[in-house]
Amino acid sequence: MFPNSPDAFHQVRMMQSSIKASNFKLQSMEFRCHSNNVCEYQMEMLHHLLSVEAKTLPSLSLIEQQPEIKLGMRPLLLDFLMEVITILNLSRSTFPLTVNLIDRYCSTRIVKKQHYQLLGLTSLWISCKNLDSKFKVPTLNDLRKICVDSYYKELFVEMEKHILKSLEWVVNAPTFDAFIDLYSNLLISNSSNFEVANIIKKSSHKIKLFSNYIGELFQFYPNIYYDYTSSQIALIAILITVLTLKIPVDLISLLNFYNGLVKTEMFKSNVEQGAEDQFEEILSVDSFKSLFNKSFFKNLIKIIDNPPSSLKIKYFAENGKYSVLMKQLVTTASNTLKCILDPVPTTPKANSFVKHQQQQHHYHPRPPMSINTSMIPLTPVSNSTSPNRFSPDQIFSENESTPGIAFGTMTPDSQSTSPGEKRSYECIDELEIGTSTIAGYTLKNHDTLKRSKSANYGTLFYLQQ
């Protein structure tokens, strides 16, 4: 290796970063310095994220008009992509950005069923290039092996061009995890209420971890994901976390605090005169009350207790980084939600004892939240065309993998409602995420795969002008 070659400089940088990473005191000092600097620009960051978010929203009505792609196919593709992200150890923001790219492309172009996995992996590839370290970005050979030789390498490059042109090269979009970090920092640095700020600061790690888990779960359910923006999903996830983990903070006060941020003079000073990005509130109190009802809590228990297989691998693996903590948080959240739905009956003697204890400790109970039994929305997974599974041993290996699965295999159409029609929670009992078998779709013979690869690249994508 030459002393002045780029590889030599890269090795020096890697060695220095490893030395810094092993110094906990240095890391703590850098984090405190970073936090102090970020606090000065939090309002500018909030305004920027909300402005960009309004311009990068997908359209549910257009996605539902896809002739071959059904909403029931979407969770299966996302489950496959999340597993890829976990195995490759990519950043947390890669998954929501990938989902945003997929949905925005499906809002502008017609996608054939056999190209849905190609779209997902190419969107993941684009997200990696924007958010992850260079050495973590998968190569074209890696992508080909991940999809078990279903597509040629040239197809990924071709699909990348189509995505970038269709989205007019607007790749970056605010993700819910960015809003969760910003919301937490805004609350911790809140100078008007030091008591709440200290409570949130003590539990900030648990709040961020569980809020991100809930946000990732919501990505798999179109009726939650499309009914709310990333900023609202992040706020809903934080409110659910505060409620289920029994953090002593009033939810309505917390909601009013975040809605009040967009009305402050510091926030409005970032808005140009005559600009269209005028924000009244992030999530209205009426929307909050209509969402947090018995039906939502009942299905939230099912969602939290039965995550997709990819999230089980990410959060609940035996030797996982957060497996013990996540199991505790999920157990606490489930028990809290069950208590909200079915309160434990108490005797008059027990009630008088509790009241006596509350008076001794000057405890002021939170006023009960009104429960509205009307509706809101989740679409469960249906059995439809599923992405190809892969083995981690196939990635970064020298041996060529054997073609085994093609994404375009014909399967029964997924269950979906007509465009624009609301889906309900009731159908979640019939189909659950964990019951989808993905490894069962195989080619009848190798000639089918050869014919799919010998197609003309110029006619692969039906681009509607």
Swiss-Prot record:
Any GO molecular function: cyclin-dependent protein serine/threonine kinase regulator activity
Any GO BP annotation: filamentous growth
Protein biosynthesis keyword on record: no
Signal sequence annotation: none
Family annotation (SMART domains): CYCLIN (SM00385)
Keywords: Cell cycle, Cell division, Cyclin
Function: Essential for the control of the cell cycle at the G1/S (start) transition. Interacts with the CDC28 protein kinase to form MPF.
Homology family: Belongs to the cyclin family.
Record-linked PANTHER family: CYCLINS
Name the record gives this protein: G1/S-specific cyclin CLN2
Gene that produces this protein: CLN2
